[in-house]
UniProtKB/Swiss-Prot annotation:
Encoding gene (name): cln3
Protein's name in the database: Battenin
Record key words, sorted: Glycoprotein, Lysosome, Membrane, Transmembrane, Transmembrane helix
Glycosylation sites: N159, N196, N199, N200, N203
GO biological process: aggregation involved in sorocarp development; cell-cell adhesion; cell-substrate adhesion; hyperosmotic response; hypotonic response; intracellular water homeostasis; mitotic cytokinesis; negative regulation of cell population proliferation
Tagged with keyword Transmembrane helix: yes
Gene3D superfamilies membership: MFS general substrate transporter like domains
Pfam hit, one: CLN3
Similarity field: Belongs to the battenin family.
InterPro entries: Battenin_disease_Cln3 (IPR003492), MFS_trans_sf (IPR036259)
Length: 421
């Protein structure tokens, strides 16, 4: 079926917003090796990942439970402010200390997590297929971010200059949301951003209205989910609604969290120690292996996040099992260095990204698509899944810190070389 101008316009806008939303976050991850080495904290590389995601968990909680009814436009303005503070802070941190750098990275992480939570919730106003535009944008952000950092370092630019150069992306993000996106007319009437969910002690008439909303949703195809929408009963309290929605998405959301835990342990904790550190080796690919691992991982994410138009995976649990096995391999590799070819490791990191991206795009597609989730509850269900993504990455950061200070401590370089400032 051909897509009209509005659909294409929105797809492009969501794509580039997804790219920008995760761009700074991905650059920080690619730079984490150099940043931790510059501050003589290679053993604490996990703290950078933790700062980049942990405070994002708080922002997701706030967006889900405290400011659910706040206008999305205001949220985006605030998010642009967070982006700017984070980038400027990281750029200035090389003149201060590691703690200041961590605080600035926290703002970068907040902007990425909060922005994702806001935009995914906002997408309930649009056809479910547009999640592919957003997901492919977030996927390409990793490729662009890691390539950008590798190229800038190769060009001899300092970390300060690199992060200052990223500031114009914030303005583009702002313009795309306010002037690029256009809510389809046939959805605008039924799905307003100011919809007030606070009065959950609804009467029978509202119960009937909810049933009708589910029945008239023409945007999505049927998925064999074993039944129709679980419409909220009359008199449902806010707490009861939270519990009911959690039950609707718990399986897919928990699988997504596990996949993210496994892949971040592999792509950060495992990849950082996957090769023997030799200061006398001037091979570009080995010297910059961690940043290149980040690129390979993000390349895999991009490919799989852009695959929704071609293949849809309903059995999410299979991806979780494969990623768990993959994580075990990378931990063993970090300890024993079994695979000596950096090129084989690069390919295996692409595979890691493929699994992660596939889980992400298919879980959110299912949430936006499944008939058993009422339209008015999709935003909350999306926020639950996004929240558990952050939980998975936060736990991964903590696990990496434990690994680097315990059974992998002997593999961490004892001396740190300064990177460019």
């Amino acid at each position: 079926m051909g897509k009209d101008y509005t659909f294409i316009r929105n797809w492009i806008s969501f794509h580039f917003m997804g790219n920008i939303n995760n761009f700074s976050y991905c650059v920080v991850n690619a730079a984490s090796g150099n940043l931790s080495a510059y501050f003589h904290n290679s053993k604490n590389i996990g703290i950078i990942l933790w700062a980049n995601i942990a405070f994002g968990l708080v922002s997701r909680l706030v967006n889900t439970f405290l400011i659910e009814n706040v206008n999305s436009k205001l949220k985006i303005v605030v998010n642009c402010l967070f982006m700017s503070i984070g980038l400027i802070g990281v750029a200035l941190s090389v003149y201060v200390n590691f703690g200041f750098c961590i605080a600035a990275i926290a703002f970068v992480g907040i902007a990425s997590s909060f922005g994702e939570s806001v935009i995914l919730s906002y997408m309930k106003k649009f056809p479910a297929e547009l999640v592919n535009g957003w997901s492919s944008g977030t996927g390409i952000a990793g490729v662009c971010g890691s390539l950008f950092y590798i190229a800038m370092v190769a060009a001899g630019l300092s970390n300060s200059t690199i992060f200052y150069m990223m500031l114009p992306t914030v303005a583009v993000y702002f313009l795309l949301f306010f002037f690029g996106l256009k809510v389809p007319n046939h959805l605008e009437e039924d799905r307003t951003d100011n919809h007030n969910n606070s009065n959950n002690s609804s009467n029978n008439s509202k119960y009937t209205e909810k049933q009708s909303l589910v029945k008239k949703d023409q945007l999505i195809e049927d998925i064999d989910d074993g039944g129709g929408a679980e419409v909220a009963p009359p008199g449902e309290t806010k707490k009861q609604r939270y519990i009911r929605c959690a039950r609707l998405v718990w399986f897919n959301a928990v699988n997504l969290a596990l996949v993210y835990f496994f892949e971040y342990v592999a792509s950060v904790g495992g990849a950082d120690l996957a090769l023997k550190k030799d200061p006398n080796n001037d091979n570009f690919f080995i010297a910059n292996a961690f940043a290149i691992f980040s690129f390979c991982y993000q390349l895999g994410v991009l490919i799989s996040r852009s695959s929704l138009q071609f293949v849809k995976i309903k059995h999410i649990g299979v991806i979780t099992i494969l990623q768990g096995i993959n994580m075990v391999f990378w931990i063993i590799q970090a300890k024993y260095k079994m695979v000596t070819s950096v090129w084989v490791l690069f390919i295996l990191m692409v595979y890691c990204g493929l699994l992660g991206g596939a889980s992400y795009v298919n879980v959110f597609y299912l949430i936006l698509h499944q008939k058993n989730i009422p339209n008015e509850d999709r935003e909350l269900c999306i926020n639950y899944a996004a929240l558990l993504v952050t939980v998975g990455i936060t736990l991964a950061a903590c696990f990496i810190l434990v690994m680097d200070h315990t059974f992998l401590a002997s593999e961490v370089p004892k001396t740190d070389s300064s990177s460019s400032t």
